[in-house]
Amino acid sequence: WIMGHMVNEIYQIDEFVDLGANSIETDVRFDDNAMAEYTFHGVPCDCRRWCHKWEYINTFLEGLRRATTPGDSKYRSELILVVFDLKTSQLSSSNAYKGGKLFAEKLLRYYWNGGNNGGRAYIILSIPKIDHYAFISGFRDALKESKHEDLLAKVGYDFSGNDDLDSIRSALNKAGVKDKEHVWQSDGITNCIARNLNRVREAVQNRDSANGYINKVYYWTIEKYVSVRDALNAEVDGIMTNYPNVIVNVLNEDNFRNRFRMATFEDNPWEHFTR
């Protein structure tokens, strides 16, 4: 999965898919009442990126739905996965559950079209703080209460704060998520700073273990050719990047073209990939 980073305006969906992304990451900001309000990263953000692009969340979700609905004039068949980077630091731990419920209701209305021929992309809820695991509980409960529990088949989970893996596993379990139940594990840091792959390798080992909790591992945010090669050699499933074309180029190199390929819609993002 080539994951286009910081896609916060609708026009950027086409921009990143044109560069080779089959997945995007979008930043979600909340108001004081725990309601998702707009897509926005803000400063600081990655080097060589403009941090201030934004869209009202309802508008963005409608644009995203069109980009991922077969038959729509804006449809991009390549776009199969969306990571919502949920800026829950604005929420209190006690408000996280409410935030999750409200976000599920918003996705149901504006992205899934009330469960009637909505967008087809898989969704990952990416939360920076393990203390906010109740966001996941609220999200899941809202879909169950609205009789759309079937949509949870399209939803996965990630904690992005580079916490200890055992602590993340515990937080997921508290949220009602079983081991290897649609779990993506991220590791990374802004592209302005170098980071070693020690924790990535630990996560990959967990993913490949019979008693691990992880389905997929992704690394963020990189675009240097050497960093991309190192990440692929560490056997990650996804790479988040500002330059999807760099990942495409590396995948076409002799060392990688027979080991990796781009994921398609037929590839289940919740299944462990075995060579």
Swiss-Prot record:
Co-factor: note: Binds 1 Mg(2+) ion per subunit.
Active site per UniProt: H5, H41 (nucleophile)
Coarse class of the protein's main subcellular location: secreted
Catalytic activity: an N-(acyl)-sphingosylphosphocholine = an N-(acyl)-sphingosyl-1,3-cyclic phosphate + choline; an N-(acyl)-sphingosylphosphoethanolamine = an N-(acyl)-sphingosyl-1,3-cyclic phosphate + ethanolamine; a 1-acyl-sn-glycero-3-phosphocholine = a 1-acyl-sn-glycero-2,3-cyclic phosphate + choline; a 1-acyl-sn-glycero-3-phosphoethanolamine = a 1-acyl-sn-glycero-2,3-cyclic phosphate + ethanolamine
Highest taxon above the source species: Eukaryota
Sample GO molecular function, one term: phosphoric diester hydrolase activity
Binding site residues for Mg(2+): E25, D27, D85
Cystine connections: C45-C51, C47-C192
Any GO CC annotation of this UniProt entry: extracellular region
Gene Ontology BP terms: killing of cells of another organism; lipid catabolic process
Tissue-specificity statement: Expressed by the venom gland.
Enzyme Commission code(s) on record: 4.6.1.-
Residue intervals passing through the bilayer: none
EC top class named in words: lyase
Cofactor: Mg(2+)
UniProt keyword list: Cytolysis, Dermonecrotic toxin, Disulfide bond, Hemolysis, Lipid degradation, Lipid metabolism, Lyase, Magnesium, Metal-binding, Secreted, Toxin
Gene3D superfamilies the record matches: Phosphatidylinositol (PI) phosphodiesterase (3.20.20.190)
Localization terms from the record: Secreted
Function of the molecule: Dermonecrotic toxins cleave the phosphodiester linkage between the phosphate and headgroup of certain phospholipids (sphingolipid and lysolipid substrates), forming an alcohol (often choline) and a cyclic phosphate. This toxin acts on sphingomyelin (SM). It may also act on ceramide phosphoethanolamine (CPE), lysophosphatidylcholine (LPC) and lysophosphatidylethanolamine (LPE), but not on lysophosphatidylserine (LPS), and lysophosphatidylglycerol (LPG). It acts by transphosphatidylation, releasing exclusively cyclic phosphate products as second products.
UniProt family annotation: Belongs to the arthropod phospholipase D family. Class II subfamily.
Name the record gives this protein: Dermonecrotic toxin LruSicTox-alphaIV1
UniProt lineage: Eukaryota, Metazoa, Ecdysozoa, Arthropoda, Chelicerata
